[in-house]
Amino acid sequence: MDCIATFDTTHMALFFEKSCRSVGLKVKIVPVPREISSSCGLACSYPCEDEEKVRSIAAEKVIEVSDYHRL
């Protein structure tokens, strides 16, 4: 199952992706799914089993994540 992290800015999405990949996590930039938001924007998709690591990196790097979702 994949999870999605959403962001208010493109900069935060790209910074999140780079930070996660730098420690070997499988993260990819994706459009925000319509069921989450009708607005345009970027999100990051990652395996749900990495949820704890992903949240830890976001907190450590002070990355502003709008929300986390399970798909």
What are these regions (language model features)?
Residues M1, T10, K26-A43:
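Amphipathic, hydrophobic secondary-structure cores in small proteins
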Residues M1-D2, L71:
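Absolute protein N-terminus
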Residues T9-L25:
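Short amphipathic alpha-helix segments
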Residues V23-L25, I29, S56-A58:
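Preference for short coil/turn "hinge" residues that link or interrupt alpha-helices
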Residues S39, A43-L71:
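C-terminal structural segments of small proteins and small subunits
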